[in-house]
């Protein structure tokens, strides 16, 4: 049972651990074969025969209850500290920075394509609103021209890609987004 859980955990990891998966599965198969052989030989019929069981794995446990092999537990103990670092997703705390001083820099494509409201939401056009317009119906073109909000993950990434200059409040004359900069009717 533990060996199958181990094999599942190794399969869930990336291709880095693939050689360990092959080793663990072959070791587990050898252990199961040897354990079934020991249980067959330990019956009353063969009690008078004293022949050692030949095994490809050294020091096979003789207990019938213990079906896990020694090598599997050793591999599990060696790989267990490595698994969290392998399975952890990479995090980019800062997306763009200067080479000389390491200061944050703004990705200009974000400034051109998105609008940040003062409440922290980002506004964008729908994807593909300028592409292949000849094959799209007028209704579909109208839907694509609409503005939509970015989700939480996108907003966090866009905040990392811009400096504090772009997060300050701006008071433009006749700003069409003036009524959207502050959130209202929020239950906190």
Curated annotation (Swiss-Prot):
Q: Which domain of life is it from?
A: Eukaryota
Is the keyword Ribonucleoprotein assigned to this protein?
yes
SUPFAM superfamilies the UniProt entry points to: L35p-like (SSF143034)
Offer one example of a GO biological process linked to this entry: translation
UniProt GO cellular component terms: mitochondrial large ribosomal subunit
Print the keywords alphabetically: Mitochondrion, Ribonucleoprotein, Ribosomal protein, Transit peptide
* Cellular compartment(s): Mitochondrion
Q: Which Pfam families match?
A: Ribosomal_L35p
Q: Which GO terms describe its molecular function?
A: structural constituent of ribosome
Which family does the entry's similarity section mention? Belongs to the bacterial ribosomal protein bL35 family.
Q: What is this protein called?
A: Large ribosomal subunit protein bL35m
Recorded source organism is: Pongo abelii
List the gene name.
MRPL35
């Amino acid at each position: 049972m533990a060996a199958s859980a181990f094999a599942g955990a190794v399969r869930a990891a990336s291709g880095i651990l693939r050689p360990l998966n092959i080793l663990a599965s072959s070791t587990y198969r050898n252990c199961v074969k040897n354990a079934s052989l020991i249980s067959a030989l330990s019956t009353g019929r063969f009690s008078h025969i004293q022949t050692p069981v030949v095994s490809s794995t050294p020091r096979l446990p003789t207990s019938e209850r213990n079906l896990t092999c020694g090598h599997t537990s050793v591999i599990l103990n060696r790989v267990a500290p490595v698994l969290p670092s392998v399975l952890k997703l990479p995090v980019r705390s800062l997306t763009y920075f200067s080479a000389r001083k390491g200061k944050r820099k703004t990705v200009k494509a974000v400034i051109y394509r998105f609008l940040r409201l003062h409440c922290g939401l980002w506004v964008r056009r729908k994807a593909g609103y300028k592409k292949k317009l000849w094959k799209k119906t007028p209704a579909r073109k109208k839907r694509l021209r609409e503005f939509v909000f970015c989700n939480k993950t996108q907003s966090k990434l866009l905040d990392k890609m811009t400096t504090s200059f772009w997060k300050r409040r701006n008071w433009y004359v006749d700003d069409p987004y003036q009524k959207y900069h502050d959130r209202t009717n929020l239950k906190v």
